[in-house]
Amino acid sequence: MDDEYSKKAKREGYLARSVYKLIEINEKFSLFSSGNVLDIGASPGSFSQYAYKKLKRGILVSVDINDIGLRYDDNFYFIKGDIFLDDTVFKINTFKPYSLVISDVAPKTTGNRLVDTSNSFNLSMRIIDLSLEVLLKKGNLLVKVFQGGDEMQIFKKFEKYFKFVKKIRPKAVRKNSFEIYFLGKSFGK
């Protein structure tokens, strides 16, 4: 489906329209600072493309169970793996600490909203738990979540660990989508 964001992504050389969600959030909340960035669920790669452009110092580590179509010569590492597996977590930990963790990952959808939101919840909680292990003090975390399940539990977890917490629905989210983003800034209160 070619909407205005899809066409804009093609024109500007991004791999997916989802990049405009990250751009909008970053313009409002200044996610990037010096330090390493971790992109969990990086495929197809548009979040990583933008993150790489925004690197001030440090490296970008992109993780996904699928390959992504990005290769950069410097300051970029791709880890093909599942964040639920120890081997992948070990590789992620090799580059810690991170000043920012971003995730636009979504589970494979079934069409059953209850199942999909439950799977999104489990995936989001895993990303948060992993982020708590690898984030720098005062680091930032951005995670996509499907609405309609236990997202308030996720929000409360953010509030426990971050000084600033915000629920965001960027303009680039499709009208019929039930995705939102949770942002936590200044880890470690």
UniProtKB/Swiss-Prot annotation:
UniProt-annotated catalytic positions: K144 (proton acceptor)
Catalytic reaction annotation: uridine(2552) in 23S rRNA + S-adenosyl-L-methionine = 2'-O-methyluridine(2552) in 23S rRNA + S-adenosyl-L-homocysteine + H(+)
Top-rank taxon, per record: Bacteria
Gene Ontology CC entries for this record: cytoplasm
A molecular function (GO) term: rRNA (uridine-2'-O-)-methyltransferase activity
Family: Belongs to the class I-like SAM-binding methyltransferase superfamily. RNA methyltransferase RlmE family.
Name of protein: Ribosomal RNA large subunit methyltransferase E
Species in which this protein is naturally found: Borreliella burgdorferi (strain ATCC 35210 / DSM 4680 / CIP 102532 / B31)
